[in-house]
Amino acid sequence: MGTGLSLSPSYRKATLFEDGAATVGHYTAVQNSKNAKDKNLKRHSIISVLPWKRIVAVSAKKKNSKKGQPNSSYQNNITHLNNENLKKSLSCANLSTFAQPPPAQPPAPPANQLSGSQTGVSSSVKKAPHPSVTSAGTPKRVIVQASTSELLRCLGEFLCRRCYRLKHLSPTDPVLWLRSVDRSLLLQGWQDQGFITPANVVFLYMLCRDVISSEVGSDHELQAVLLTCLYLSYSYVGNEISYPLKPFLVESCKEAFWDRCLSVINLMSSKMLQINADPHYFTQAFSDLKNESGQEDKKRLLLGLDR
């Protein structure tokens, strides 16, 4: 009906042990091959681990050497600085106790050279100019002293010489005009003290010197221009804030007075600021005003010699 085939498991085992020597040798060869593979694996792992340990050790030595170098250089720097400080302290101590020897004098020249050099020195001394006491940068100090009445007289003489067409003008006439205005303001209570002082007369002279023309044809015209300059002097260097116009007016038209004021301001504004800020400029104007009297004396002397 049907056939069946059955294979027993012991049949393969039987074949393995059919030849005893052959089977044992084969088994031994298989085991040896397995052991050789294991030994190779172990040997490779040991070989790979040894260089890694060496690399780690070498890197650690390098790090230690790098860390040690800054410390050694720092110690060297400290030692060098200590040595330098010690040398400086020793040098300072030596300088404090050091006595400088006197400089050696040059040898004396022969007699003939000495006489020639002495004559040359004497000639050079004669030719050399004497140095000035003051330095070149600083101007010389000038002292000028004068009273109020003296300066007013000098101002009157200046106006008489400037206005040569006014034959009957006296040096005292301008002085009377100025004192009349000053007295009027005192009596009216516009000022507590007189305005006519040496400094204010110098300021007025500075204005009159550039404003009053030599072509003035009448005493009235001269008085109008002079009182205009006096009003500006009051306004600029006076003690009060404002002053009335009536004492300064010699004419009924105020527009003419203000026109003269504006022309004087446009002409003399810079000098009015300069005389207040520069003391040397004020001293020069003071000296010029005082010298006006000397010019009058010279003129009188020349007129006497002509006669």
UniProtKB/Swiss-Prot annotation:
Brain and neuron specific. Residues 100-110 have a biased composition (Pro residues). This is Cyclin-dependent kinase 5 activator 1. GO terms for molecular function: cyclin-dependent protein serine/threonine kinase activator activity; protein kinase binding. The p35 form is proteolytically cleaved by calpain, giving rise to the p25 form. P35 has a 5 to 10 fold shorter half-life compared to p25. The conversion results in deregulation of the CDK5 kinase: p25/CDK5 kinase displays an increased and altered tau phosphorylation in comparison to the p35/CDK5 kinase in vivo. Residues 96-136 are annotated as: Disordered. Coiled coil: none annotated. The modification Phosphothreonine is found at residue 138. GO terms for biological process: axon guidance; brain development; ephrin receptor signaling pathway; regulation of dendritic spine morphogenesis; rhythmic process. InterPro entries: CDK5_activator (IPR004944), Cyclin-like_sf (IPR036915). p35 is a neuron specific activator of CDK5. The complex p35/CDK5 is required for neurite outgrowth and cortical lamination. Involved in dendritic spine morphogenesis by mediating the EFNA1-EPHA4 signaling. Activator of TPKII. The complex p35/CDK5 participates in the regulation of the circadian clock by modulating the function of CLOCK protein: phosphorylates CLOCK at 'Thr-451' and 'Thr-461' and regulates the transcriptional activity of the CLOCK-BMAL1 heterodimer in association with altered stability and subcellular distribution.
